[in-house]
Amino acid sequence: MEKYILSIDQGTTSSRAILFDKEGKIKGIAQREFKQFFPKSGWVEHDANEIWTSVLAVMAEVLNESNVGAEQIASIGITNQRETTVVWDKHTSRPIYHAIVWQSRQTQGICQDLKEQGLEDKFRNKTGLLLDPYFAGTKVKWILDNVEGAREKADNGDLLFGTIDSWLVWKLSGGQAHITDYTNASRTLIYNIYDLEWDQELLDILEIPNTMLPEVKASSEVYAHTIDYHFFGEEVPISGIAGDQQAALFGQACFDRGDVKNTYGTGGFMLMNTGEEAVSSKSGLLTTIAYGLDGKVNYALEGSIFVSGSAIQWLRDGLRMINSAPQSENYAERVESTEGVYVVPAFVGLGTPYWDANARGAIFGLTRGTEKEHFIRATLESLCYQTRDVLEAMEKDSGIKVNNLRVDGGAVKNNFIMQFQADLLNLGVERPEINETTALGAAYLAGLAVGFWDSKDEIANRWNLEKEFQPDMIEKDRERLYKGWKKAVEATQVFKLEDE
């Protein structure tokens, strides 16, 4: 009987279940979207119960569509939208409030208060993170402060907190396991990534009782088993967990110090494996945990690009310049260059290394000769310029010279972007055969724990290159183009509209 790993990929807009065979090939995929809630401007929430039912639905669908029985599942791996926060009653398993999503800015006031108290360096030095609404800790505090009766229930030990991985393990196991893994813990703003434990001082500052916290485990071990009535009569081990970007790093077999992957999704996320050393950043990068495996923890530097693939959606849906994302490649290749046009897509501010929340998008270099093709090409090029910004920050902070870049995400299908990226970085850009690297990473972690795969070496040998893009631009042109981008970003940061 052939066995498979079931990977649950719980994302920001949809839940997916993907079956992988022993070769790391995809046997089947199922996907289901769920509702987004926007109670106030800048707030984003999900219904944690709807996330759970969507996961149940896609698990059933992928088994059914693939004609695979539950008894053929060797283990389950989970990868998840990071930082999104659920607080639930441990007796009823009912959430006491919506899940507050990573994008949500509703804890801006809490973060501002903490900064004004001079606490930013304390949080940074213990967690590797910035004091930002992005991370989970302030979301927990917000729920306890704003939901009636929550603070009292928490103090009585009746409430549990978890990121989405914890919530799904709790539900799949029928409440037998309240756990998370190192990667998700490292995104909470209350986990000390150096001591590898929840930080009591930070918990006290945010007034979070430690009875709420999940136990932190390795990214690959048997945490619990499914209860049979949640998994079609079978008790299957749940044995791999990683936050989505760390899972992609693992799925790309970036196991060595200095290995880098960039995900071109809605936003862009670059991670560099820094080995067993946690590198502090002076360039606006985050220090985080890459994975915990074999009794050791690997660290990573992470850079965030707020607008990546969503810039192409903007061309399609906002400006209606193109009918489909693939069309952008065709338009970009019709012209030799942008003729000096730069698009800075700072629609929601600038991420790494600028961290300018008040910057807004801008276009520079327009002339009467500017045509649609130049504009589209400049928008695609902006993804690559932002990637170079982050990579240069990583090389500076780590002291590591990067030799190549592994890529994944929706925009990597665009050959123009990949070639321009190689030209701009003067590096080989490696596109893998399997683009589902996030789900694959979770599957690998789950499979290693139960002997489905033997070692990281075996996994590294399974990584297959679909295409490598080699640089084909002279240095003078490369540096002239990048210098123009830096001037465009600088001008964008100067232009600020004051609030009325």
Curated annotation (Swiss-Prot):
Phosphohistidine modification, residue list: 230
Annotated control of activity: Activated by phosphorylation and inhibited by fructose 1,6-bisphosphate (FBP).
GO molecular function: ATP binding; glycerol kinase activity
Coiled coil regions, renumbered to chain: none
Binding positions for glycerol per the UniProt entry: 82-83, 134, 244-245
The reaction(s) this protein catalyses: glycerol + ATP = sn-glycerol 3-phosphate + ADP + H(+)
Keyword Thylakoid annotated: no
Pathway(s) of this molecule: Polyol metabolism; glycerol degradation via glycerol kinase pathway; sn-glycerol 3-phosphate from glycerol: step 1/1
Residues that coordinate or bind ADP: 12, 16, 266, 309, 410, 414
EC assignment: 2.7.1.30
Family: Belongs to the FGGY kinase family.
Subunit relationships: Homotetramer and homodimer (in equilibrium).
The name this protein goes by in its record: Glycerol kinase
Source organism per UniProt: Staphylococcus saprophyticus subsp. saprophyticus (strain ATCC 15305 / DSM 20229 / NCIMB 8711 / NCTC 7292 / S-41)
Lineage: Bacteria, Bacillati, Bacillota, Bacilli, Bacillales
Gene from which this protein is expressed: glpK
